[in-house]
């Protein structure tokens, strides 16, 4: 399976 998504970008 594909890797999990990374963390959200900083604002």
From Swiss-Prot:
Enumerate the GO terms in the molecular function aspect.
toxin activity
Query: Could you tell me which species this protein originates from?
Result: Bothrops jararacussu (Jararacussu)
Q: Which residues carry this modification: Hydroxyproline?
A: 3, 9
Subcellular location field: Secreted
GO CC terms on record?
Answer: extracellular region
What are the cysteine partners in each disulfide bond?
none
Keyword 4Fe-4S, does the record have it? no
Name-wise, this protein is 1095.6 Da venom vasodilator peptide
Q: Which domain of life is it from?
A: Eukaryota
Q: In which tissues is it expressed?
A: Expressed by the venom gland.
Q: Does the keyword Transit peptide apply?
A: no
Keyword annotations from UniProtKB, A to Z:
Hydroxylation, Secreted, Toxin
- Give a short account of what the protein does: Toxin. Induces vasodilation in mice and rabbits.
């Amino acid at each position: 399976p594909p890797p999990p998504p990374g963390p959200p970008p900083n604002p």
